Each structure stands twice: as C-alpha cells, then as structure tokens.
C-alpha cells in the first residue's frame, strides 16, 4: 500500500491577532511615521496579522536590498529571492509594490487597506502578493506519527 502523511493545515486569518504580541518589533530601516525612538511590541506596532505579515515581507525585501546593493550582512533566512523564471514575476512585483498602507489610524499602528476598500478605489485584489505575504506567518511545526491511528469518521477526532 501507499504510506501517507497527514499534514496540519492552518488557515490564515488576516484580521486576526498578531503573532508574538509582546515581542519587541525591530524597526530596521523603517519609514513608519510613528515614533521610531520608542521600542514597540508587535501588538503596539500592527493592527492585525495581515499588516504584520506584509510588514515582515517588506522588512525581508528591505534587508535583501541592503545586502545586495549596500553590502550589509543578514542571516540568509531573513532575506528573500524570487526566481527570474517565474512567468508572472512582473505581475507579482506590481502587486507587491502597490499594497496600500493606511495612514489615518489614530493608534499609529501599521495598517493595510482592506480588500473592500481597495475594490472601492478600483485596485485589483493582490492575490499573488497575498500568497507571498501569507508565507511570512509563523506556524508551529511539529511531527506526529499517525500510522497507528486514524480520525474517527463519526467525531472527526483522532482515536
């Protein structure tokens, strides 16, 4: 028979809470309009998970720019690279460059314009950019041997 592996799927809830809310955010190269002299934690920095993940992607791209163009050193897992062979690379780049950030929130937190707001302004949904952004979300990885048990069809729980 075929030996399979079960994979835990974790849905992305962009409007949900930020990851590691009490960890201090490192504002490397930030052009954020807030007080960059004051340390802020993730909960103070971002309105939701979507904003946090887009900002993490922005930071990763900025670090890559600093590494490639300015000679700065960063760990490889803090950088990003896209294959030049991606057929929709120009479209992906366009989407990533036009993610609108909101500046009018009183909290001073990073906020990304919602999809309904983008639609009202005639901005197409950034589906490719969203896919790359979602990869920034922290997911706990664990291993479990499922070969000895299987889900109960009646309850959906593991026996």
Model-derived features with residue positions:
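RNase H-like, metal-dependent nuclease domains and their acidic two-metal-ion catalytic environment used
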Residues: 1-27, 31-33, 38-159
